Amino acid sequence: MDARSIAATAANKGFLTAADEFTGTYTKPAYHFDKKIYENRVFDSKGVADPSVEIQFGPNIKDWPAMPQLAENLILKVVSEIHDPVTTTDELIPSGETSSFRSNPLGLAEFTLSRKDPAYVGRAKEVQVAEKAIQEGNCPAEALPELKPVFAAIHTQYPDIDKTNVGVGSTIFAVKPGDGSAREQAASCQKVLGGWANIANEYATKRYRSNLINWGMLPFLIPEGDLPFTNGDYIFVPEIRKAVEEKAVSYTHLRAHETCADL
C-alpha cells in the first residue's frame, strides 16, 4: 500500500481506502521541527563526558577475568576426553539459553561442554585453583595437593621446575573439534576456566584453531590411534614458551609417572 492510501485509510477510521477513492479533502499542515522532544529523551555525550563518573554495569555484564601469560613450562591436566568423530562448536558452548550470558564471560563458561561432558566445568575449576595460587605467589601443590606426586615425577628429569617458571591448567582431547559456527566463545569459555590447550587428531576448521590461538591456548595435534594419556592424567610440557617463540612444529610431552612420548 502506498503512503497516500495509508493516510486515506487512517482518515477513514481504519477502513481500507485507496488514495484515489478518498472523498475527503487533502491538507498539508505546516510542520515545525521541535528538537526539544529529542533533547529531553536522548542523551548526547559528545564533548560532555565526565571521566570521574564510574560506569554502572547491569547485573549480568561482567569484566573479563585476568588471564596470565604463558609460562616457560606447563603442567596440563586432561579434564575431558571426547571420541566422537566430530565435536561441534555448539557442543563446546551451546547456543540458545546461553545467549543472555554473552556479556558475562564467567557466567557463560558455566555452560561449557554441558551437553557433551557435564562434569567438565567442575574438573576445570579444580585445576584452575593451582594457577591462581601461582599468580598470588603461593605454592600450586598446596592449593591442589594432587600435584605433589606430579611435581615429584617431573623433578626426576627437570629438578628446577617450580612456581616461578611453570603454569598449571586444563586441556581437553577431542578427535576433531570446532565444526560449525565461528563463535569464539567455544575457545574463550575454556580459557576463562583455566584452559591452556586442546589436543586433537585434527581441527575441524581453521577458524576454531585460530580462536584457540587468539585466546592464548595451544592447539596441539596428536596422531590417530591409542592415546598416551587418559582423562585425569597430567601432561608436562617443558620449555613451551620457547617453542612458541621459535615457532616449533613438533614437541614432546611427559606424562606424570610415565615416559616421554611425541605429542
Please provide the spans of the model-predicted regions.
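A structural-propensity feature for long, helix-poor, extended segments
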Residues: 209-251
